[in-house]
């Protein structure tokens, strides 16, 4: 049963939320570290870990799933080339969330999410 298992809404409709998570995941994998709000960082962590797990698998089906999710084709190829040696011995926990200072304009909690 899915009681108490809500998806983080992030104050957006479903299509905008999915696009936001795809964009944040793409930028996290491209740059290795991004600064965003704490709620967005927690939401993007699951997606980024899922993409790295797909890259560790390395199969054609996993590559096609990653190509369907991430926005940059070249980024997918580099992720699949680097992930097995970088995260080969690690069973999950590929990201780290570090709390940061609050944003000046609206006092939102910020966090830095980075790849380990």
UniProtKB/Swiss-Prot annotation:
Q: Which residues cross the membrane?
A: none
MF terms per GO, please?
Answer: structural constituent of ribosome
Q: Which InterPro entries match?
A: Ribosomal_bL17 (IPR000456), Ribosomal_bL17_CS (IPR047859), Ribosomal_bL17_sf (IPR036373)
One Pfam family linked to the record: Ribosomal_L17
Write out the GO cellular component annotations: cytosolic large ribosomal subunit
UniProt family annotation: Belongs to the bacterial ribosomal protein bL17 family.
Task: Check the record and name the NCBIfam families matching this protein.
Answer: L17
Instruction: Indicate what this protein is called per its UniProt record.
Output: Large ribosomal subunit protein bL17
What organism does the record attribute this protein to?
Answer: Thermosynechococcus vestitus (strain NIES-2133 / IAM M-273 / BP-1)
């Amino acid at each position: 049963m899915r009681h108490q298992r809500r998806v983080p809404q992030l104050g957006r409709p479903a299509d905008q939320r999915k696009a936001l998570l795809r964009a944040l995941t793409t930028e996290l994998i491209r740059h290795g570290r991004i600064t965003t709000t704490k709620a967005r960082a927690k939401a993007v962590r699951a997606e980024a870990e899922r993409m790295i797990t797909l890259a560790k698998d390395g199969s054609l089906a996993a590559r096609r799933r990653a190509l369907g999710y991430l926005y940059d084709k070249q980024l997918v190829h580099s992720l699949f080339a680097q992930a097995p040696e970088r995260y080969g011995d690690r069973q999950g926990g590929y990201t780290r969330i570090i709390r940061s200072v609050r944003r000046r304009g609206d006092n939102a909690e910020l966090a830095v999410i980075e790849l380990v």
